Regions:
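Bacterial N-terminal signal peptides that target proteins for export
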Residues: 1-8
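Active-site-proximal loop/hinge segments that shape catalytic or ion-binding/gating pockets
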Residues: 12
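C-terminal motif of bacterial Sec signal peptides marking the signal peptidase cleavage site
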Residues: 15-18
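Post-signal peptide N-terminal segment of mature Sec-exported envelope proteins
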Residues: 26-60
Length: 188
């Protein structure tokens, strides 16, 4: 607020000096009124939100398809990191959090198509995707529907209090899928 008032005072002084042809006035920083509300610090950007999902190739090239799926999950993780950092912050950057939430929703909406037949462990290509994604598709789809619903709520949570209330259920729905449908790498 002080900066805005200072800039306005400086601009006015310069304009008056230019119009009057006299000596330029020296801008003076205004002093806050005694009863003025305390200045709330602006939120610090934790990190800019990464992008949303990349386009998937045709599933005829299984290795390329699985690589693109993995890259999408890596990018989803980066968006979740932005959300987690803002969740932990006393002054979350709601612009970055909202952008990341929009991306998470885009991932959740696209994710159901990332698991066509032949792109799982039976492909012979290393994957963190467990076979139960394909053998128990109804449970996978239910978990995905939960993530989609929670991500819609997270996108709608545009103030800090609503965001901090909604991030845990959204993150929990991600964790549920990790626990149920993801095989941790051997080197982790």
């Amino acid at each position: 607020m002080k900066a805005i008032l200072f800039a306005a005072a400086a601009a006015t002084a310069l304009a008056l000096a230019a119009c009057g042809g006299g000596e330029p006035a020296t801008p003076v920083e205004p002093t806050p009124a005694a009863d003025a509300a305390p200045v709330t610090p602006e939120p610090v950007a934790v990190a800019a939100a990464p992008t949303g999902p990349v386009a998937m190739p045709e599933p005829t090239d299984i290795a390329a398809y699985m690589k693109a799926r993995h890259e999408n999950y890596e990018m989803l993780g980066k968006n979740m990191k932005v959300l987690q950092d803002n969740f932990k912050s006393e002054t979350p950057d709601m612009a970055a959090a909202t952008a990341a939430a929009v991306n998470v929703k885009a991932f959740a909406d696209a994710m159901g198509a990332w698991f066509p037949a032949g792109t799982g462990p039976d492909s012979g290509i290393e994957s963190e995707a467990k076979a139960n994604i394909w053998t128990d598709r109804a449970t996978f789809d239910a978990a995905l529907t939960k993530l989609q619903a929670e991500s819609v709520k997270l996108v709608a949570a545009t103030d800090a209090a609503a965001f901090k209330a909604q991030f845990p259920p959204t993150g929990g729905s991600c964790k549920n899928c990790h626990d149920t449908f993801r095989e941790e790498k051997k080197d982790q």
